[in-house]
């Protein structure tokens, strides 16, 4: 069931989202060859806690870290490690959920580690374009199918597909709320 939040609650969700975005922006600037994914995790936790937030992934269903750090072909939910050292040319997806004043913010970025190859840059560009194509369809009168169709249609010409096992979702008091938003769908 979809929760309908009051304007005041939406502002609190937005504040959690802003802290999430600020944390990801800081991490994007911090990513460099030679650092471990564990170091990124430590930076994220300190940044969030210093601003009154709580790293919501840490301890969630036993997850041991603040961020999910997925390097190269790790699809999602990579666990930060002192042994996972970033190399020039890698790409890393950093997924993060922040709780602030009882409300959640959730976002992910994918960035190159130093300079990377054209194939990786194309993947980053195509997935970012797909995100914005989906957002463009998130308007009154459209369906979740319109959003998913836009995402999948955007990446197909690049030779990419979507993972049907993983979906977007609502956010609010809970980390994963309805509706589920697949990256595929039928418009209308």
Language-model-detected regions and their locations in the chain:
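Active-site neighborhoods and metal-handling regions in enzymes and metal-associated proteins
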Residues: 1-188
């Amino acid at each position: 069931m979809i929760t309908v939040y009051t304007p005041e609650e939406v502002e609190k969700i937005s504040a959690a989202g802003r802290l999430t975005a600020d944390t990801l922006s800081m991490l994007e600037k911090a990513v460099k060859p030679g650092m471990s994914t564990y170091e990124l995790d430590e930076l994220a936790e300190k940044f969030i806690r210093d601003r009154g937030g709580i790293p919501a992934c840490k301890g969630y269903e036993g997850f041991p870290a603040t961020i999910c750090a997925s390097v190269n072909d790790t699809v999602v939910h990579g666990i930060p490690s002192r042994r996972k050292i970033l190399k020039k040319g890698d790409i890393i997806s950093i997924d993060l959920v922040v709780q602030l004043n009882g409300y959640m913010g959730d976002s992910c970025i994918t960035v190159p580690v130093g300079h990377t190859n054209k194939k990786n840059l194309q993947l980053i560009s195509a997935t970012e374009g797909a995100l914005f194509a989906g957002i463009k369809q998130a308007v009154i009168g459209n369906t979740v199918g319109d959003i998913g169709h836009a995402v999948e249609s955007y990446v197909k010409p690049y030779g990419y597909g979507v993972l049907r096992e993983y979906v977007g979702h609502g956010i609010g008091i809970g980390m994963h709320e309805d509706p589920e938003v697949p990256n595929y769908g039928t418009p209308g």
